[in-house]
Curated annotation (Swiss-Prot):
Similarity remark: Belongs to the bacterial ribosomal protein bL33 family.
Protein source organism: Metamycoplasma arthritidis (strain 158L3-1)
Domain of life: Bacteria
GO biological process, one term: translation
Keywords: Ribonucleoprotein, Ribosomal protein
Pfam families referenced in this protein's UniProt entry, alphabetically: Ribosomal_L33
Record-linked InterPro entries: Ribosomal_bL33, Ribosomal_bL33_sf, Ribosomal_zn-bd
One of the record's GO molecular function terms: structural constituent of ribosome
Keyword Ribosomal protein: yes
UniProt name for this protein: Large ribosomal subunit protein bL33A
SUPFAM superfamilies, per database record: Zn-binding ribosomal proteins
GO cellular component, one term: ribonucleoprotein complex
């Protein structure tokens, strides 16, 4: 797994860091995922 880095996805509503994943692209990752703290699907953005 060369050229990949581990990132954390944080909820944009409550700022909880819920998910971690690997990525190999250079732009910032934004995904709609379920947040257990907000109890709904929200936008999660990449944290460093």
């Amino acid at each position: 797994m060369k050229n990949t880095k581990k990132i954390t996805l944080a909820c944009q509503v409550c700022l909880a860091k819920n998910y971690s994943t690997n990525k190999s692209v250079t732009n910032r990752l934004e995904i709609k995922k379920f947040c257990k703290h907000c109890n709904m699907q929200t936008l999660h953005k990449e944290e460093k």
